[in-house]
């Protein structure tokens, strides 16, 4: 009889262990955007605490250096600064575009409209080319930088969100925690970066900017920018831009989310804006 009870207990323990092993797989299947929305926990007095409790992600303070006009009808999806000009890619079906802008005035100096069936996304410069992603069409567009003439295209097998370039590659986001490394000549994928915050995937990575060995990424539906190690994919810091529009007495009712990061290497400053924002901000970071 004792042996019978013992056998039953052993079977029960084995059943519980098997159920626990199945639990992580179910969690992965259900994570999706919910995991991304919870990726930044509540802030503390020092920084943003990582999910595993191992420490705090440092928050970088900023100062506003300049405020420039920005087209309030521009649904900003990509932003690059080069040689005194801004290059901006915008989205929405029927109104997606690629533009060269005067930074000081926000005036459009050159522009090309995308086909109405394409939703424009991230933008990057490579040599004499401008590369622009599209959202769900799996199509990348290539233009001449000087004349905005379309000179080619390429395909990819995921959604297109943000795009930037380091010294060797293009780096592309797709709304998950994965960054895709593309060859800038063939546009073939040659690697990936798994972005984590406190050991957990950081989802909803959007517009990107490569700055001195790190990748700055807008987190969709937030006012935050993650600072990511190019080598490890670990989040090293965070910029919280909540309230930056209100400081300029801009109503947030008519605007969409923060999106758009461009590095001004001449001034060592960062240009940031958002979808339908009437302002573009030049900020300088300083550690807390």
Enumerate the language-model features and the residues they cover.
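Blade-loop segments of beta-propeller domains
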Residues: 105-143, 148-160
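Beta-rich, blade/repeat-based domains predominating
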Residues: 72-83, 116-126, 156-173, 199-213, ...
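Hydrophobic, well-structured mid-protein blocks that either form specific transmembrane helices
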Residues: 140-198
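Short loop/turn segments that connect beta-strands within beta-propeller blades
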Residues: 101-106, 144-148, 184-187, 229-233, ...
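Conserved beta-strand positions in repeat-built beta-propeller and related beta-rich domains
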Residues: 87-93, 130-137, 170-176, 217-221, ...
């Amino acid at each position: 009889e004792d042996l019978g009870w013992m056998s039953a207990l052993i079977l029960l323990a084995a059943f519980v262990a098997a159920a626990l092993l199945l639990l992580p797989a179910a969690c992965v299947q259900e994570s999706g955007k919910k995991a991304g929305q919870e990726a930044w926990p509540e802030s503390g007095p020092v920084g943003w605490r990582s999910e595993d409790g191992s420490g705090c992600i440092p928050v970088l303070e900023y100062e506003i250096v300049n405020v420039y006009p920005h087209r309030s009808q521009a649904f900003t999806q990509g932003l690059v600064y080069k040689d005194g000009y801004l290059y901006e890619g915008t989205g929405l079906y029927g109104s997606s575009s690629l533009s060269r802008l005067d930074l000081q005035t926000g005036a459009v100096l050159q522009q090309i409209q995308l086909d109405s069936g394409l939703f424009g996304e991230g933008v990057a410069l490579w040599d004499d080319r401008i590369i622009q992603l599209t959202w769900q069409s799996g199509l990348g567009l290539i233009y001449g930088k000087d004349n905005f003439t379309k000179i080619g295209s390429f395909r990819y097998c995921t959604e297109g969100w943000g795009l930037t370039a380091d010294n060797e590659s293009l780096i592309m986001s797709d709304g998950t925690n994965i960054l895709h490394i593309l060859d800038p000549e063939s546009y073939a994928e040659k690697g990936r970066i798994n972005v984590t915050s406190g050991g957990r995937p950081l989802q909803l990575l959007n517009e990107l900017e490569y700055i001195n060995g790190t990748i700055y990424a807008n987190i969709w539906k937030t006012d935050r920018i993650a600072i990511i190690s190019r080598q490890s994919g670990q989040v090293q810091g965070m910029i919280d831009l909540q309230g930056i529009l209100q400081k300029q007495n801009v109503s947030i009712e008519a605007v969409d989310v923060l999106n758009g990061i461009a590095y001004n290497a001449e001034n060592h400053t960062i240009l940031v804006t958002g979808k339908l924002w009437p302002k573009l901000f030049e900020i300088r970071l300083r550690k807390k």
